[in-house]
UniProtKB/Swiss-Prot annotation:
EC number(s) on file: 3.4.24.-
Top-level taxon of the source organism: Eukaryota
Topological type in the membrane: Peripheral membrane protein
Gene Ontology CC, one term: mitochondrial inner membrane
Name recorded for this polypeptide: Mitochondrial inner membrane protease ATP23
Function field: Has a dual role in the assembly of mitochondrial ATPase. Acts as a protease that removes N-terminal residues of mitochondrial ATPase CF(0) subunit 6 at the intermembrane space side. Also involved in the correct assembly of the membrane-embedded ATPase CF(0) particle, probably mediating association of subunit 6 with the subunit 9 ring.
Subcellular location: Mitochondrion inner membrane
Similarity-based family: Belongs to the peptidase M76 family.
InterPro entries: Peptidase_M76_ATP23
Gene that this sequence comes from: ATP23
Primary localisation category: mitochondrion
GO molecular function per UniProt: metal ion binding; metalloendopeptidase activity
Amino acid sequence: MSKEPNFPPSEKLEKVEAPADLRSIAGFEWWRRTFEYKTGLGLTPEAKVQYEKDYQYVLQREQCKQCYDNRDWLLKYSPTVVFMTQQIAKLNRRRTGDDSLHFDTSKIICDVCPEWKSGGFNPSLGILLCQNRIRDKWQMEDTLSHELVHQFDELKFEVDWMNLKHHACSEVRASNLSGECRLSQEFFRRGFNGSFGRGHQECVRRRAVLSVMGNPKCKDKAEAEQIVDEVWQSCFNDTRPFEEIYR
């Protein structure tokens, strides 16, 4: 998944351990500590530091639960996500000869991401959804659809992710087919900037270039733009497994 331009550098984020006494982050005691923190009444420096640490744990726990709830909902009810998981399962059955294989939802995980991105795909590990970056269910639908296109490509075309042309082609397809470049999304991100007539293609190209720039084999933006241009025509027009751009 690509990053949008001009984002700040990665934050120093880490998963916070649960407090020794879970009662301190529940019920009246958590309300009392929150009131104390916000008003400063009776708040010691040590209590302030501990509250901030515990707050991060509570926040990450809530984000994680919401992320998995949204993931499970999309796996049941999103037409794009359901279709893509069906197509991926079909490819897996064809490759293995095992007709009992279903899509493995355990390979879609939620976690905290320091980088300013909403998700990622790793051929060995599966799909990552960034619980602290995804603002709502509908952004997750775009993100999950994007990463599922990468997973489909990995199975269908045996992508070499260190080959810049392979990588660029999959990024073009993922941004084109996921819905992340539809008009409403571009307006949300960029307002009235750019041409609405060419907005979809400009968005797909921009996001593909940014993703390729993140490949360790890519020297700079100029090379990323050149590679995307070289694969553009064939990859933008390749809508498999859809018959056309669905979203």
